[in-house]
Amino acid sequence: FRLSNLAAEKIVDDIESIFENKKNFFEQDHSKATYANKINKEEGRIDWNDKAENIIGKINGLYPVPGAWFYFDGARYKILKASVSKNSATPGKVINDNIEVSCGTNSIKILEIQREGKKIQNIKDFILGTKIKKGVNLINA
């Protein structure tokens, strides 16, 4: 709520500055402009060999669509929230009962997840009904 108030104040200040000719505008240098391709769903696939920090970046950067995801037992799972942990094991291995997954460097603690066709769940609720357990490896699962 505070951020929206600050943004509203800033917009009013900027509009006033424009009308008072206090803003300097510069045309973009088109020779330095770059093009970003459309993000496709496949870019959201998680590579467990990557660093945990990079995977968290993918989760945050691709949220909510297309999302960061992995396959397990024929179903696609989208991770919506996660955090970095310092534990490690073989990349892709679930290393504890809270579904913490080891990555190339460190691990991620999954906090919120969604199985395809199902509702979003916090990890505590998800654990109660999943086959993803400690010791399972999510690479090629």
Question: Which role fits each region the language model picked out?
Answer:
Residues 1-85:
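Active-site-proximal loop/hinge segments within enzyme catalytic domains
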Residues 49-141:
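An anion-binding loop in the catalytic cleft
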